[in-house]
Amino acid sequence: MRGIRSKIPRALNAGAKIECVDNTGARTVEIISVKKYRGVKNRMPKGGIGDMCVVSVKKGTPEMRKQILYAVIVRQKKEFRRPDGIRVAFEDNAVVIVDDKGIPKGTDIKGPVAREAAERFPKIGTTASMIV
């Protein structure tokens, strides 16, 4: 896992329900916590693009529902600025289910993936069909 060059705003709080865009069987997940988040006492953990989260599967196949898994945020609606000055924003918030080492569990990712997430997790970059 590498560092991200641009400063990503952490726009997704714990409790946010997000679409899962891979073919693992999960459709909607809820963020429980964000890995390596360091905040103040009683502050809700927040995540942005490229952050690994602990999620609970809310909608999906019966085998996937009610499971606690790891996921990486690959898209967010809140815009962020890249070092070259371009501002990037996506139409939706999306995650990809991964294992504890950051390797995706699915074999296909629907829609675009942010370049920052693909650089931090190279296996997500190779699985993605489109990197923006």
From Swiss-Prot:
Binds to 23S rRNA. Forms part of two intersubunit bridges in the 70S ribosome. CDD domains: Ribosomal_uL14 (cd00337). GO terms for biological process: translation. PANTHER family: 50S/60S RIBOSOMAL PROTEIN L14/L23, LARGE RIBOSOMAL SUBUNIT PROTEIN UL14. GO terms for cellular component: cytosolic large ribosomal subunit. PROSITE patterns: RIBOSOMAL_L14 (PS00049). It comes from Methanococcoides burtonii (strain DSM 6242 / NBRC 107633 / OCM 468 / ACE-M). InterPro entries: Ribosomal_uL14, Ribosomal_uL14_arc, Ribosomal_uL14_CS, Ribosomal_uL14_sf. The keyword Cell wall biogenesis/degradation does not apply. HAMAP family: Ribosomal_uL14 (MF_01367). This is Large ribosomal subunit protein uL14. The gene is rpl14. Belongs to the universal ribosomal protein uL14 family. Part of the 50S ribosomal subunit. Forms a cluster with proteins L3 and L24e, part of which may contact the 16S rRNA in 2 intersubunit bridges. GO terms for molecular function: large ribosomal subunit rRNA binding; structural constituent of ribosome. SUPFAM superfamilies: Ribosomal protein L14. It comes from the Archaea. It holds the Pfam family Ribosomal_L14. Keywords: Ribonucleoprotein, Ribosomal protein, RNA-binding, rRNA-binding.
